Amino acid sequence: MTAQINLKDITVQFGPNKAVNNVNLEINKGDIYGVIGFSGAGKSTLVRTINLLQYPSAGSVEVNGTILFKEGKLQVSKKQLQEKRRKIGMIFQNFNLLNEETVIENVAFALQHTHLSDKELEEKSLHLLELVGLKDKSDFYPAQLSGGQRQRVAIARALANDPDILISDEATSALDPKTTNQILDLLYDLNKKLGLTIVLITHEMDAVKRVANKIAVMEKGKVIEKGDLREVFLHPQKQLTRQFVGGALQAQHILNTYNFDKLADNAELYQLVYSINDVTKSVVADLDVSLNTKASILYGNVEVLSGEPIGTLAILLNLDEQKQKEAIKFLESKNVVVTKLDKGVLTND
């Protein structure tokens, strides 16, 4: 599949500092691609190279099959760039609404460059407000709306030019948890209804887990880990990724305090991660029956990834080496991802 967005060898440098350092990122049509990292990681700077609100110091930017920037130069005319930008909507933490204009006037403002009649402007603006669930608030002013409602207006305005890409730059970070989830669910629905590709910039793993199918983790200007959300979630390679994954791998944090020196010679700790949709019965109970053993459950948790419940268990098995191998083989036959837990797994980067 040809990527809809292809960022190749992107570097953005401010003086001696590289805010983005040689990053490669491919985003396919229809993806909800989460770009996550702490403040200062470079995620907003990177994503702003997509619509060239930020020119790279090096690297190339290709969107929808058109190379926009390469070898330090713009590859399209200024007019062409403006047209391309209109097909890339953007929403921010600050809603950037016009306080003296009504909700419908705020949406229509994004269409002022068009040749639509007043009636057509009104019809399209109302349609966009209906998409975001605010048609009944068309004559309200921003000050009369809640934070979540104002962000919905911003989303409607970002969709005014029928973009096929929407960049969400920390758009939910100023909202309370309930409203955040409502906005994320709206973005997810728009992705499905409109085939909209969404680039979700955030420092909150819960936001990525709720709606994204892909993820890139950034640290100090570099993408340190990327790929399918489920794969990265189940097999985080870097310490920062493990930190963001958090809840589902809370077992690792708990087991950091475990006294491994006191384990019996044959005892081993394992982390089991599996889709609850794939498991109809208790895998541990099945294991006990199959191998005539008794696994001790030290930890259990359930996370939800884009609507898919993922279970995590930490178990202790006291078996000889051959039985340990049989246990792992049995669990893997049940679509369980098995990771042996020791101090190296728990603490090493």
Swiss-Prot record:
The keyword Membrane applies. GO terms for cellular component: plasma membrane. Disulfide bonds: none annotated. It is a peripheral membrane protein. It catalyses: L-methionine(out) + ATP + H2O = L-methionine(in) + ADP + phosphate + H(+); D-methionine(out) + ATP + H2O = D-methionine(in) + ADP + phosphate + H(+). Its EC number is 7.4.2.11. ATP binds at residues 37-44. SMART domains: AAA, NIL. GO terms for molecular function: ABC-type D-methionine transporter activity; ATP binding; ATP hydrolysis activity. Signal peptide: none annotated. InterPro entries: AAA+_ATPase, ABC_transporter-like_ATP-bd, ABC_transporter-like_CS, ACT-like_dom_sf, MetN_ABC, MetN_ABC_transporter-like, NIL_domain, P-loop_NTPase. Coiled coil: none annotated. The keyword Membrane applies. Residues 5-245 form the ABC transporter domain. Keywords: Amino-acid transport, ATP-binding, Cell membrane, Membrane, Nucleotide-binding, Translocase, Transport. It is found in: Cell membrane. CDD domains: ABC_MetN_methionine_transporter. It is an enzyme of class 7 (translocase). Part of the ABC transporter complex MetNIQ involved in methionine import. Responsible for energy coupling to the transport system. The complex is composed of two ATP-binding proteins (MetN), two transmembrane proteins (MetI) and a solute-binding protein (MetQ). Belongs to the ABC transporter superfamily. Methionine importer (TC 3.A.1.24) family. This is Methionine import ATP-binding protein MetN. It comes from Lactobacillus gasseri (strain ATCC 33323 / DSM 20243 / BCRC 14619 / CIP 102991 / JCM 1131 / KCTC 3163 / NCIMB 11718 / NCTC 13722 / AM63).
